[in-house]
Amino acid sequence: MTKEEILYNVQLCDVVYKDQKDIDFKSLGLTSVKWIDDKKSDTQAFVALKGKSLYVVFRGTSSKKDAQNDVSIDKVPFIKEGDKVHIGFKSSWDAVKNIILKDITKMSGYDKIVVCGHSLGAAVATLCAYNLSHVFTDTTIECCTIGSPRVGNKTFKNNYDNQKIKTLRIVHNNDVVTHSPVIGYYHVNHMLRIDREGNIKKFMIDWERAWNYLKSMVTGKNIKDHMTAGYISSLKKWYDKQP
């Protein structure tokens, strides 16, 4: 992904939290917009075209129902043998899967599918991208997420990474949500960690990461680090530093 694409994708992760009527899709360059709102699961997303790209963007936690999906830690089977994923995240994806697949199939003129989301939306986007990579096997699949929790077991993580999905999982400083669920869950590749000044943070050893996390917990900054506004602000600083 180019730096322009990364910043655009992250802005879409924020825009999807608005009511449909309040989103200026035209100014975003999006056409053929299909808005999805599953009332039962409280899962929202949109499918749209922008040039040769088809976008699928998921909203994150925005209600009590979403929060209930977040806190469950049980795992259930997914696509390949050995895949186990978070039951709440899979429930959200299952609620909208058929309509999204139908909308994508109806659209034409694109050569890649870009899936985006924040928080719970990031987890659902990860499952969506993985699912789409098994259905649209001749189409490039990209996945750009911010503030994503861990989604599944190690087998799922390995199978996902082997699908050659062009993934960028962005972590803002000490975002608390990216540390959960803890036991038996793993992150998919590839991670870009940035601090509040827009600097890329290299891999930290466990004790260093834990220390920074604890410091942020004391100050409450790890909650702020999870907000889309923080991601956008820091990524804009990162963007301005790029050649």
Model-assigned labels for residue ranges:
Residues 1-116, 120-243:
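Non-catalytic, mobile gating and regulatory segments of ester bond hydrolases
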